[in-house]
Amino acid sequence: MVRSRWKGIYVAKELQNYNTVSNPTIVTTERSSVIIPYYLSKTIYVYNGRKYVGVKITEKSLGRKLGEYVLTKKVEKYKASKKVKKK
């Protein structure tokens, strides 16, 4: 479902009050926060459940959520089965 327009966009309080002058790295666990223009050309480290993954913010990513750029599940790679040669 889409968030109601009258509520506005959701940005975590820890991201709103972040001072990049004293601490240039932004670290958060809020995957549901919307990317706003204040974070343009900065790197935000988002927690995916195991480790923090860096997300570089560009103009194309404005208005989207941080969780869209951080995968939480490992991509499964299937190995090719070995064929047995008959003698």
UniProtKB/Swiss-Prot annotation:
Predominant subcellular localization, coarse grouping: mitochondrion
Gene Ontology molecular function, alphabetical: RNA binding; structural constituent of ribosome
Biological-process GO terms, alphabetical: translation
Keyword vocabulary terms for this entry: Mitochondrion, Ribonucleoprotein, Ribosomal protein
Gene3D superfamilies for this protein: 30s Ribosomal Protein S19, Chain A
Localization annotation: Mitochondrion
Entry's Gene Ontology cellular component terms: mitochondrion; ribonucleoprotein complex; ribosome
PROSITE patterns in alphabetical order: RIBOSOMAL_S19
InterPro entries reported for this sequence: Ribosomal_uS19 (IPR002222), Ribosomal_uS19_CS (IPR020934), Ribosomal_uS19_SF (IPR023575)
SUPFAM superfamilies: Ribosomal protein S19
TM regions (residue ranges): none
Record-stated family: Belongs to the universal ribosomal protein uS19 family.
Protein name, per record: Small ribosomal subunit protein uS19m
Originating species: Dictyostelium citrinum (Slime mold)
